[in-house]
């Protein structure tokens, strides 16, 4: 069995685990608010940002200076002691880094292009900053590791797949530990891109709400240290699938998502009735919430409490999988109440197939949580975490 030895996280809920746990319990995200300068033709857009100072990247790593890598360092700092112990125990060549991202340092590239367009000097930009492989390369260099290091980019399931890949490397005997997770930061291109697709909500996103109008984009980073060393929280099972149906729309019957969840349950040797909570992908787009409701209804009916936390973190794109898996771990680790779905801006959509969406916080009845990530292109990943004796 693969265990989660440590976790670090930063997003609109807070800059460390204590802040995130407190605000998750309150149902309040300090970083979620209207922000200016991001959406072309609009004075403001509701975005979920990270506030406060971030770690500086020294001159030695100047080619990797991006906000994406800064928030990765902020997440890493929260599990640095456990990472140091793993390096001492296993050696630098026996630790992998597998990360997920959708945009990497795209914001820095965008800033560079704007400066050059207006014939202004651009002195801090390096091409490596916007490469998709840069987050894992940077972290590997930062920690002076010699094990496998690579980045996955499968849209919104990127970091969920990074968790699965890290587990696979350990099970294959290629490494003894894996630092897994991902990061994405606010960037004008995806914000304006989702707006052009009519998928960016003009207000705070409303997952499973009647008047839902699209996603709220957020930024964040999360990291987990996976090992075989027994810990209170384990990675019980995983599942992956591809719809092979459409470039952006999910399969109309959720066939790929159902396969991913069933794979995870089979891998964990569990049944749907063993699951105590489902952290839904719940993006608040019309199609995602409709299809995910079909999927959850088909497999779990209304028996299992579920909710989306994207009204608190925003959709952190490539970091969504690690963000929601880490939130699930926090619930298990600290016995937090399950986060309720907020229907204050829009009533629940009565046309969606019924599932166990909770509207008030409640305790976790069974110590197993399913975290789903269903990405563009039908790229699906499901992860089961649980407390173990």
What residue spans do the PLM features occupy?
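Conserved small-residue
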Residues: 6, 24, 97, 139, ...
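Glycine-rich phosphate/pyrophosphate-binding beta-alpha loops
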Residues: 12, 103, 155, 285, ...
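Structural signature of cysteine-dependent C-C bond-forming condensing enzymes
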Residues: 85-96, 114-124, 138-148, 171-178, ...
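ACP-dependent fatty acid/polyketide chain-elongation machinery
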Residues: 1-62, 228-236, 326-341, 386-389
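Glycine-/small-residue-rich "gating" segment that lines the acyl/pantetheine channel
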Residues: 120-123, 164, 185-231, 245-247, ...
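Active-site pocket-shaping loop/turn-to-helix segments
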Residues: 58-78, 123-131, 149-161, 206-222, ...
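Conserved beta-ketoacyl condensing-enzyme motif
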Residues: 4, 32-153, 272-288, 303
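Condensing-enzyme catalytic core mediating Claisen C-C bond formation in acyl metabolism
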Residues: 2-5, 17, 22-36, 42-44, ...
């Amino acid at each position: 069995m693969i265990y989660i030895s440590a976790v670090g996280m930063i997003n609109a809920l807070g800059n460390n685990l204590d802040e995130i746990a407190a605000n998750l319990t309150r149902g309040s995200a300090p970083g979620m608010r209207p922000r200016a300068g991001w959406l072309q033709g609009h004075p403001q857009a509701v975005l979920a940002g990270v506030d406060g100072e971030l770690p500086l990247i020294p001159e030695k790593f100047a080619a990797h200076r991006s906000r994406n890598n800064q928030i990765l360092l902020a997440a890493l700092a929260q599990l640095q002691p456990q990472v140091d112990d793993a390096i001492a125990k296993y050696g630098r060549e026996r630790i992998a880094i597998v990360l997920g991202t959708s945009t990497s340092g795209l914001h820095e590239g965008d800033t560079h292009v704007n400066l050059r367009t207006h014939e202004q000097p651009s002195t801090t930009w390096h091409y490596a900053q916007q490469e998709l492989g840069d987050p894992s390369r940077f972290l590997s260099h930062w920690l002076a590791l010699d094990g496998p290091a690579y980045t996955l980019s499968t849209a919104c399931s990127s970091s969920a797949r990074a968790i699965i890949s890290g587990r696979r490397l350990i099970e294959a005997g290629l490494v003894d530990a894996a630092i897994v997770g991902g990061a994405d930061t606010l960037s004008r291109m995806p914000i304006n891109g989702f707006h052009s697709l009519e998928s960016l909500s003009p207000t705070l996103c409303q997952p499973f709400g009647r008047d839902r109008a699209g996603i709220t984009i957020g930024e964040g980073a999360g990291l987990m240290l996976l090992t075989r060393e027994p810990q209170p929280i384990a990675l019980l099972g995983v599942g992956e699938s591809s719809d092979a149906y459409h470039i952006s729309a999910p399969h109309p019957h959720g066939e790929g998502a159902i396969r991913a969840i069933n794979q995870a349950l089979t891998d964990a040797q569990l049944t749907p009735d063993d699951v105590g909570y489902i952290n839904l992908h719940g993006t608040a787009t019309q199609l995602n919430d409709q299809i995910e409701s079909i999927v959850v209804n088909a497999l779990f009916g209304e028996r299992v409490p579920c909710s989306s936390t994207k009204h608190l973190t925003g959709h952190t794109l490539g970091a969504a999988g690690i963000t929601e898996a880490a939130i699930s771990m926090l619930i298990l680790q600290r016995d937090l109440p399950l986060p309720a779905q907020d229907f204050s801006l829009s009533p629940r959509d009565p046309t969606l197939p019924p599932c166990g969406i909770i509207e008030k916080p409640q305790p976790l009845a069974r110590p197993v949580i399913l975290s789903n990530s269903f990405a563009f292109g039908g790229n699906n990943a499901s992860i089961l975490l649980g407390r173990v004796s």
